[in-house]
């Protein structure tokens, strides 16, 4: 992963790549609460919801897809 990326953006991309906050945490050597915190901070900074969390499934919102596309 690009070392120049903001840690919150790195976390977002890891969650998208792994499909899981827990797996992203393991990949990044973070705790799951730290991953959740990074995503919450990013959502607050951008004033959008990035993920929908329904019945144990994680999916990107329309706005989240745009953020991910720009981050890559």
Where are these regions (language model features)?
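Short helix-boundary/capping micro-motifs
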Residues: 15-29
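The N-cap/first-turn positions of alpha helices
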Residues: 5-11, 32, 64, 71
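Core residues of bacterial helix-turn-helix
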Residues: 27-28, 39, 46, 67
